[in-house]
A protein has these predicted regions:
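PLP-dependent amino-acid enzyme catalytic core
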Residues: 1-309
């Protein structure tokens, strides 16, 4: 059994990490549509610990697991990830002195694999054909087989995933753009969309929340879910989205090049997909302020970026 001192030590270390989570800047997205009455803004989520939006959920999951004595120094943090959450777990885990094991689809980018290895995480690869669904199943099986060994974070079912955005991302958006009209974001674990939208709806019921998903099952937007053909995350609340728009992978990739040309630095495929969705929405409405999320930059997607830019 872990000692109370050991658990308290983790809590103390957590306090030093928290200032580096969230509070990301908001960027006005210009040059991609012609409607002067519509403004698009995006949160630059790589401007925090571990370099992606997933730092928010990973930190909140770990923090609450430690406070509830579910994650102790003698247990391994276990979860399935397409990359970014795994990197966030590994980054925070390294700071806390915790061991981390990630179930990762084998087609994850080489950069993500290398980052996870450099942070000391154990990687167990699953089939590229099964995606994160297969990785989730494998993680669950491993946790059930050795419950004394692992804390299974289960980001797709863990309420602390969406709560990180309810208490963090949404509050920041309300502070930065209190008069927003639309929030639009892609669906992966669905935590970002669910948590942010839930809080925004409580703040102002007139705010429209639009979910984005790939336009068909065989897509190349890693981490995103095509809800009709995959296991829907337990934390997803279908009543929250006013609409669901579909985004094409190739069109999304075009926005990587467009963004680079306009702003001078590249972004990830999922960030470009959110911009593509926001622009699609901008062309459908007469006026309004749209807020979206740029989950990460292009640092972990070299192979994709080289083909586009």
């Amino acid at each position: 059994m872990p000692t109370l001192t050991a658990t308290n030590s983790l809590s103390t270390k957590l306090a030093t990490i928290e200032p580096h989570i969230g509070n990301t800047p908001l960027l006005r997205i210009e040059g991609f549509h012609d409607n002067e009455n519509v403004q698009i803004f995006a949160k630059l989520e790589w401007k925090q610990l571990s370099g992606s939006v997933k730092a928010r959920a990973a930190y909140n999951i770990i923090k609450n697991a430690i406070l509830e004595n579910k994650l102790t120094p003698d247990k391994i943090l276990l979860d399935a990830s397409s990359g970014n959450t795994g990197i966030a777990y590994a980054t925070i885990g390294k700071e806390l002195g915790l061991n981390v094991t990630i179930l990762l689809p084998e087609n994850a980018s080489s950069e993500r694999k290398n980052i996870l290895k450099s942070l000391g995480a154990e990687i167990i690869y699953t089939s590229k054909f099964g995606g994160t669904d297969e990785a989730q199943d494998a993680a669950k099986e491993l946790a059930e087989r050795s419950p004394e060994k692992y804390f299974y974070a289960d980001q797709y079912s863990n309420e602390n995933n969406w709560k990180a955005h309810y208490h963090g991302t949404a509050e920041e958006i309300i502070h930065e753009k209190p008069q927003l009209d639309y929030f639009i974001a892609g669906l992966g674990t669905t935590g970002t969309f669910v948590g942010t939208s839930r809080k925004l709806k409580e703040y102002n019921a007139n705010i429209q929340t639009i979910a984005l998903q790939p336009d068909f099952a065989l897509h190349a937007l890693e981490g995103w879910k095509h809800l009709e053909t995959v296991t829907v995350p337990k934390i997803y609340d279908e009543t929250i989205a006013d609409r669901i728009l579909e985004v094409n992978t190739l069109i999304s990739h075009q926005y990587i090049a467009k963004f680079y040309e306009y702003y001078g630095f590249p972004i990830s495929p999922s960030s470009a997909a959110n911009i593509a969705g926001a622009v699609q929405l901008a062309k459908q409405i007469e006026k309004g302020t749209i807020i979206t999320i740029l989950p990460d930059n292009a640092d972990k997607y070299g192979d994709v970026i080289k083909k586009i830019i």
